[in-house]
Amino acid sequence: MQGRSSAWLVKHELVHRSLGFDYQGIETLQIKPEDWYSIAVISYVYGYNYLRSQCAYDVAPGGLLASVYHLTRIQYGVDQPEEVCIKVFAPRGNPRIPSVFWIWKSADFQERESYDMFGISYDNHPRLKRILMPESWIGWPLRKDYIAPDFYEIQDAY
């Protein structure tokens, strides 16, 4: 079954894959990393001007990493928002996805957190650096293959 967003992308010959609908009826689409930035710009122009959230997850140990974007479009009133979920999968060895910071400013800290926890590099992000972990931290703590260190010394802030 094809949703409204998928039908619109097909009409404009934009490459994607429909992953169906979640329990709330929100359509989920898969976009390739190399197509993501252009589709993000087009989605913004189409009316998806609110990035509700961005997150990431590890699909499987040794598998792909995913960056997930929840976009909202309000056309007929605030009580009837149109939402879409976009998933962009990247290989674990070199996870690179174009940043959407320049489209939706709210992606700033969210992409930084995904970088900090999963090691996904967001190309053209203006301040892509660790946000939760110390700069000296080694590894990506939320990856399924991450091995936690036995000891980590945190220096006093005073």
Swiss-Prot record:
| InterPro entries linked to this entry | NADH_DH_suC, NADH_quin_OxRdtase_su_C/D-like, NADH_UbQ_OxRdtase_30kDa_su, NADH_UbQ_OxRdtase_CS
The set of disulfide-linked cysteines is none
Protein's GO biological process:
photosynthesis, light reaction
Gene Ontology cellular-component terms for this entry are: chloroplast thylakoid membrane
Gene3D superfamilies in UniProt: NADH:ubiquinone oxidoreductase, 30kDa subunit
Instruction: Give TM regions.
Output: none
| Any one GO molecular function term | quinone binding
Q: Does the keyword Thylakoid apply?
A: yes
Per the record, membrane topology reads: Peripheral membrane protein
Q: Tell me the keywords, alphabetical order.
A: Chloroplast, Membrane, NAD, NADP, Plastid, Plastoquinone, Quinone, Thylakoid, Translocase, Transport
Intracellular or extracellular location(s): Plastid, Chloroplast thylakoid membrane
Q: Report the EC number(s), separated by commas if there are several.
A: 7.1.1.-
A Pfam family found in this protein is Complex1_30kDa
- For the protein in the UniProt heading, the enzyme class is translocase
What PANTHER family does UniProt report for this protein, alphabetically? Answer: NADH DEHYDROGENASE [UBIQUINONE] IRON-SULFUR PROTEIN 3, MITOCHONDRIAL, NADH DEHYDROGENASE UBIQUINONE IRON-SULFUR PROTEIN 3
Per the similarity annotation, which family is this? Answer: Belongs to the complex I 30 kDa subunit family.
Record's function text: NDH shuttles electrons from NAD(P)H:plastoquinone, via FMN and iron-sulfur (Fe-S) centers, to quinones in the photosynthetic chain and possibly in a chloroplast respiratory chain. The immediate electron acceptor for the enzyme in this species is believed to be plastoquinone. Couples the redox reaction to proton translocation, and thus conserves the redox energy in a proton gradient.
Q: Known NCBIfam families for this protein?
A: PRK12494.1 (NF009141)
**Assembly mode:** NDH is composed of at least 16 different subunits, 5 of which are encoded in the nucleus.
Name of the protein: NAD(P)H-quinone oxidoreductase subunit J, chloroplastic
Q: Which organism is it from?
A: Ceratophyllum demersum (Rigid hornwort)
